[in-house]
A protein has these predicted regions:
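Glycoside hydrolase catalytic-domain context in secreted enzymes
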Residues: 3-168
Length: 168
């Protein structure tokens, strides 16, 4: 933190399972398990509780939700996603964002949400993480972009870029 320049220190954690890096914090089921309930309120509530626990330990920025639409079961990060259905991923991810940020994310029990990983990181060639993607424009627009459109409309404050090459 640079006090004389008023640049705040932001502490972020990978909160896919809640604030699970801290002893005594609640460890929530994986997102794909939460998604299996088709209960948006559950996802929202997990977001609220995660934000509360994160702020109590000094964190401000949750590197979650993962709104990749899972397309290849061989991909090693399937459990971090809300599944293979673009509608379900959109609804559960948006609910999580709303729970984490609760409107504007300013306040003692709110955190910055980070929708990740833009874009199409979940359909790598042969299921290998970091592999390039070869997808059509239609697939991009109908499968991968809807969760991000909804996240932006919900006011997500940050989006994490993917590390994969798309149609390169």
């Amino acid at each position: 933190c640079i006090r004389d320049r008023k640049i705040p220190l932001l502490i972020g954690i990978d909160a896919i399972h809640g604030n699970a890096l801290y002893r005594g914090a609640t460890v929530y089921p994986s997102p794909i398990t939460i998604a299996s309930t088709w209960d948006e309120n559950n996802s929202y509530d997990v977001g609220i509780q995660t934000a509360h626990e994160m702020r109590s330990t000094g964190s401000h920025w949750a590197f979650t939700p993962n709104i990749d639409v899972m397309r290849d079961a061989r991909w090693g990060r399937v459990g971090e996603t809300f599944g293979e259905d673009p509608y379900l991923v959109t609804q559960m991810g948006t609910a999580m964002i709303n729970g984490l940020q609760q409107g504007d994310f300013t306040g003692t029990n709110k955190v910055i949400a980070c929708a990740k990983h833009l874009i199409a990181g979940s359909e790598p060639i042969n299921g290998l993480n970091l592999s390039p993607m070869d997808i059509s424009e239609r697939t991009l627009n109908e499968i991968y972009l809807p969760p991000y459109k909804s996240a932006i409309e919900a006011g997500v404050f940050s989006i994490m870029a993917a590390h994969n090459e798309v149609n390169g």
